[in-house]
Amino acid sequence: MWIGTCELDVLLGDVHSLKQKRSVVRPLVAEIRRKFDISVAEVGHRDLHRRTVIGVSVVSGDREHVVEVLDAVERLVASHPEVQLLSVRPRYFSSEDL
């Protein structure tokens, strides 16, 4: 079994309040969840209105599938013009590592 996690550090564009931040982040999180059927949540910078960290995780029997899904999530987030992807921190674990 393979487990992949990824933290995507994101700078939000023209956002001036936490309410505006939610209107950008929630649809993005929902789109990731819908397209890839994986666990996803806002996991960092929750109190800053122009930054967020989105965390995703995927489990599969195949390491290549885990890598493909996390790469696709990164491309999806990077393709949104209202956000700028600052950094991506993927991690891969085998059940034998745990």
Write out the residue ranges for each language-model feature.
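Residue-level signal for beta-strand positions within conserved beta-sheet cores that form or flank
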Residues: 36, 52, 84-86
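Short, well-ordered turn and helix-capping elements at secondary-structure junctions
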Residues: 12, 42-44, 92
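Non-catalytic surface loops within mature trypsin-like serine protease
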Residues: 12-14, 60, 94
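A structural signal for short, well-ordered beta-strand segments
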Residues: 6-10, 54-56, 88-90
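N-terminal first-folded block
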Residues: 1-39
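C-terminal structural segments of small proteins and small subunits
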Residues: 62-98
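Short, charge-patterned binding micro-sites
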Residues: 3, 41-62
